[in-house]
C-alpha cells in the first residue's frame, strides 16, 4: 500500500560564527562536520585563521569587529562599527534564511548573537574555557542554549540554559594515522606544544632544558609555532622540530608526556589521548583563563600546573626528568599511568555530536 507522496525535507540553514584562534575555529569545524545534512554559512573576520581553514569548505562572510575591552561604549567609532556589524549580520541572516546560529564566543559572537536575537533566531553558544569570556558572560542570556566545555564555567553563568558537552574535536583526530617521524619504537617521547599560535617563552625554556633530557635518552618532538625566532638553533638526532602539524593526534598517541599551554582545545586533545602533561598557562590570556583550565586538570591528577613566571630552566629540567625517570630505565614507580588515566576521564568522546543535536533540537 502506498504511503502517499514523499515529502522532501528542506536542508537546515545555519550560520557559524567562529573567528580568531584555533580555540574558537577548530571546535566549530568539529560541530560543522557533525552536521552533514545542514547548509552552513560561516561568519568570520578578515585575515584571521578562518580565512585559511574555512573558505574552501563553507561560504565565508567577513565583518570587521573588535572586543569589549575598556569603556568601548564611550568610544563612538567602536560603537558605530559594532552597530554596523550587527546590521550587516542581520542582512546576512535574512538573505541566507538562517534558522539557527552557532558561535564559539570571542569578538565575532557579539554581532552574531545580537543580530540573531533581534530577528528571533535561536543561538547556541559554546564556551570552552573554565572561566567564560566577557562576551559569553554578557550575551549568553540572549542564547537559547549555552554549551560548556567545563562544568565549572557554570558558576559564572547563573540562570543560563546550560549543558556540559566538553570541547568538540575534529573527526580527523579520531581517525587512525601515522606520525611519519623517525622515532624508534620503544623510546620515551616528550611532546612540546605551544598552542595554535606557538609559544616563544616555552620554546626557549625547552631548548635550554633539552640537553639534559636528550643525554638521559629522551626523544623530543617540539611543535614551535610558525613565529619562532630561534628555530633551528638546537640540533640533535633525538630532537625533532616542527612548526605545525595538521593533525596532532598521532603524536599525542605516541608521546609519553607533554609540555603544553592550557588552551581548552589543547586540553581536550590531551584528554582524548589520555596523555599526562605539565601545563604552562599563557600568562597574557584574557583574564588569565588558561590558569583556570589548567587547575581543573591539575586537581584531577591529569597534569602538573607550572606558572610561567615561577618556572626556571632548572626546575623544568628536573621536573621532566623526575616524571620520566621510570620510562628512562630507573627501577622506581612510574607516575605516568595514573596521570594518563585521570586525563582520559576528562574526555567527552561525543562532544561534537552533542552540540550538533542541540542545534537540531532548535530547528
Swiss-Prot record:
It catalyses: di-trans,octa-cis-undecaprenyl diphospho-N-acetyl-alpha-D-muramoyl-L-alanyl-D-glutamyl-meso-2,6-diaminopimeloyl-D-alanyl-D-alanine + UDP-N-acetyl-alpha-D-glucosamine = di-trans,octa-cis-undecaprenyl diphospho-[N-acetyl-alpha-D-glucosaminyl-(1->4)]-N-acetyl-alpha-D-muramoyl-L-alanyl-D-glutamyl-meso-2,6-diaminopimeloyl-D-alanyl-D-alanine + UDP + H(+). The keyword Kinase does not apply. This is UDP-N-acetylglucosamine--N-acetylmuramyl-(pentapeptide) pyrophosphoryl-undecaprenol N-acetylglucosamine transferase. CDD domains: GT28_MurG. GO terms for biological process: carbohydrate metabolic process; cell division; cell wall organization; lipid glycosylation; peptidoglycan biosynthetic process; regulation of cell shape. Keywords: Cell cycle, Cell division, Cell inner membrane, Cell membrane, Cell shape, Cell wall biogenesis/degradation, Glycosyltransferase, Membrane, Peptidoglycan synthesis, Transferase. It is a peripheral membrane protein. GO terms for cellular component: plasma membrane. Its EC number is 2.4.1.227. UDP-N-acetyl-alpha-D-glucosamine binds at residues 21-23, 129, 170, 196, 290. It comes from the Bacteria. Pathway: Cell wall biogenesis; peptidoglycan biosynthesis. It comes from Synechococcus sp. (strain ATCC 27144 / PCC 6301 / SAUG 1402/1). Belongs to the glycosyltransferase 28 family. MurG subfamily. Pfam families: Glyco_tran_28_C, Glyco_transf_28. It is found in: Cell inner membrane. Cell wall formation. Catalyzes the transfer of a GlcNAc subunit on undecaprenyl-pyrophosphoryl-MurNAc-pentapeptide (lipid intermediate I) to form undecaprenyl-pyrophosphoryl-MurNAc-(pentapeptide)GlcNAc (lipid intermediate II). The gene is murG. The lineage of its organism: Bacteria, Bacillati, Cyanobacteriota, Cyanophyceae, Synechococcales. GO terms for molecular function: UDP-N-acetyl-D-glucosamine:N-acetylmuramoyl-L-alanyl-D-glutamyl-meso-2,6-diaminopimelyl-D-alanyl-D-alanine-diphosphoundecaprenol 4-beta-N-acetylglucosaminlytransferase activity; undecaprenyldiphospho-muramoylpentapeptide beta-N-acetylglucosaminyltransferase activity.
Amino acid at each position: 500500500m502506498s504511503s502517499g507522496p514523499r515529502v522532501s525535507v528542506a536542508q537546515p540553514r545555519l550560520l557559524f560564527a567562529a573567528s580568531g584562534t584555533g580555540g574558537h575555529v577548530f571546535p566549530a569545524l568539529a560541530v560543522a562536520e557533525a552536521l552533514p545534512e545542514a547548509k552552513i554559512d560561516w561568519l568570520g573576520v578578515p585575515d584571521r585563521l578562518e580565512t585559511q581553514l574555512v573558505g574552501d569548505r563553507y561560504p565565508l562572510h567577513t565583518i570587521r569587529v573588535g572586543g569589549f575591552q575598556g569603556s568601548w561604549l564611550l568610544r563612538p567609532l567602536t560603537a558605530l562599527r559594532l552597530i554596523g556589524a550587527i546590521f550587516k549580520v542581520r542582512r546576512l541572516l535574512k538573505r541566507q534564511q538562517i534558522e539557527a546560529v552557532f558561535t564559539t564566543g570571542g569578538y565575532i559572537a557579539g554581532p552574531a548573537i545580537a543580530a540573531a536575537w533581534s530577528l528571533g533566531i535561536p543561538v547556541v553558544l559554546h564556551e570552552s574555557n573554565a572561566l567564560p569570556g566577557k562576551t559569553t558572560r554578557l550575551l549568553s542570556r540572549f542564547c537559547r542554549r549555552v554549551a560548556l566545555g567545563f562544568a565549572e564555567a557554570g558558576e559564572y553563568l547563573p540562570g543560563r540554559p546550560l549543558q556540559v558537552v566538553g570541547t568538540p574535536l575534529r573527526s580527523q583526530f579520531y581517525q587512525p594515522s601515522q606520525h611519519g617521524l623517525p622515532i624508534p619504537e620503544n623510546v620515551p617521547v616528550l611532546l612540546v606544544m605551544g598552542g595554535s599560535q606557538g609559544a616563544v617563552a616555552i620554546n626557549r625554556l625547552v631548548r635550554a632544558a633539552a640537553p639534559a633530557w636528550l643525554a638521559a635518552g629522551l626523544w623530543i618532538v617540539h611543535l614551535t609555532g610558525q613565529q619562532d625566532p630561534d628555530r633551528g638553533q638546537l640540533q640533535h638526532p633525538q630532537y625533532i622540530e616542527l612548526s605545525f602539524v595538521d593533525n596532532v593526534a598521532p603524536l599525542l598517541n605516541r608521546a609519553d608526556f607533554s609540555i603544553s599551554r592550557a588552551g581548552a582545545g589543547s586540553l581536550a586533545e590531551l584528554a582524548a589521548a589520555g596523555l599526562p602533561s605539565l601545563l604552562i598557562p599563557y600568562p597574557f590570556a584574557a583574564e588569565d583563563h588558561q590558569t583556570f583550565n589548567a587547575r581543573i586538570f591539575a586537581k584531577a591528577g591529569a597534569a602538573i600546573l607550572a606558572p610561567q613566571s615561577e618556572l626556571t630552566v632548572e626546575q623544568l629540567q628536573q621536573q621532566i626528568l623526575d616524571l620520566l625517570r621510570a620510562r628512562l630505565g630507573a627501577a622506581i614507580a612510574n607516575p605516568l599511568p595514573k596521570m594518563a588515566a585521570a586525563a582520559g576521564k576528562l574526555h567527552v568522546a561525543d562532544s561534537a555530536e552533542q552540540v550538533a543535536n542541540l542545534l537540531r533540537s532548535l530547528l
